Amino acid sequence: MKLISWNVNGLRACMQKGFLDFFQETDADIFCLQETKLQEGQIALDLPGYHQYWNYAEKKGYSGTAIFTKEEPIQVTYGIGVEEHDHEGRVITAEYSEFYFVTVYVPNAQRELTRLEYRMQWEADFLAYLKKLEETKPVIYAGDLNVAHQEIDLKNPKTNRKNAGFTDEERGKFSNVLASGMIDTYRYFYPEQTGIYSWWSYRFKAREKNAGWRIDYFVVSESLKDRLQDAKIHTEVFGSDHCPVELDIEI
C-alpha cells in the first residue's frame, strides 16, 4: 500500500498550485490532508475511485483534516472523543480489516508558547486514544505533528530550543509515543539522514536555503515493523509550506 500525508495549508490555495497533479500522479491507496481550512460545502472534489471523509473546524478558515481512500473503511470516526479537543477538526480515524488509519493535525504550541499547556494535555489524551485503538488492531497514524523530534530534524536546533515545535516538553511527548511501542517510520529507514525536512517558513527564503523542520510523520505500531517497505519525504513537491510525506507498507 502507498500512503500519503500532506499539510496543504489551505486546500483551495493548494489546488491552484498543482494539488490534483500530484494526487493523480501518486495514485495512493490512502491520501490524507491536514490544514484544509475549509467549511462543509466550500469545495467539491471529484476524485473517481476514492471515498472522501472530511473533518472541519468550527472556526472558519482554520485547521481541518481529510482522508481519501480507495478501499471503503469498515467505519470512520471524527475526533478522539474528548470534548475539549474535538472542535477543531484535527483527527479522522478510518478502520480497516487489519489496522486503524488515523490522520492528525496536532495543535501548535504557538509563539510565546501560549498553547503549550493545552498541547501537553492534547498529547496525553491523543496517546491514550491511540493505545485504546491498539487494543483491537495495529495503528498507522500520519500528519503534521508539529514537533521536530531530534536535533537532526531541523536546520537550526540551537536557536529554536525554546520555540514551539522544538521545546523539551514537546520532544519529550513524542519520545513517550515511541517508547510506548510505536515507530517513526522515516527514522526507521534513515536513522541518521540530515538535511531532509517537510516544512519551511514562508519567511526569510527558508525553502530556498533549506532551513526547514521535519514535523510531518507516519508513525506505526511496532507490530507492523516487518511490513514496512519505505518512507519518503517529497521535498520536490511545492504547493504548500509543507511537502507531502509517504509510507509504503505491505498490508
Language-model features and meaning:
Residues 70, 94-97, 221-222, 247-251:
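Active-site beta-strand termini and strand-to-loop segments that position acidic
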